[in-house]
């Protein structure tokens, strides 16, 4: 979230809304500063981090120029693409939506994924095209001859950072992904010095691809969740017995790995005394 205002006073209202929906409250996408604010105001909340959802943030000039030995493999991809294809780059407009959706369907046909996730992505892409101007989106399209072979869509985070939301390419054209990545970065206004290419969702191939562009940093996105009474007692016991462990580590375990069905506890006077 943008801004520096205190949002923690809204948590009781958020919890009431979650209860009405029959769900526990989880506050996702928190920055480290936001998570710390939640913990200070509501110590009964735990914080966990998920590497799969951390955003990859790059220097825009690195993606524009691909200079240095570490980017030699990327330049090789581009050289092969340019040698084999008569291509051109255009700014993406909603008029290209049918071609983009066609390419997305072709891309999807060659990838194993959950049908529900893919359907959600298709709906999101179609809504993006339907409201392209209202959402202040911009994108790029790569053609070989008259055929669209790659496209990308994104939006500004602020005056310095731009976020890539969608990038698709026809993998039959070696280097198309690398080409659209660089061309779009080159056509962004120079005041964008950072490019956020979002998360890898824990997909190994996607992770290796994003790492191969050498991110400047990975932006943590933390989740806050109210701990159950048992989890609160376990946290207190754990930290008392193992003071060298951090609260972050304990809460990470309790929220991401702990399963009360597999945890044996001993109680004294109604409280957990051993686990």
What name fits each language-model region?
Residues 21, 84-85, 135, 191, ...:
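Structured helix-beta-strand junction loops
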Residues 48-56, 216-227:
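Conserved catalytic-core motifs of GNAT/GCN5-like acyltransferases
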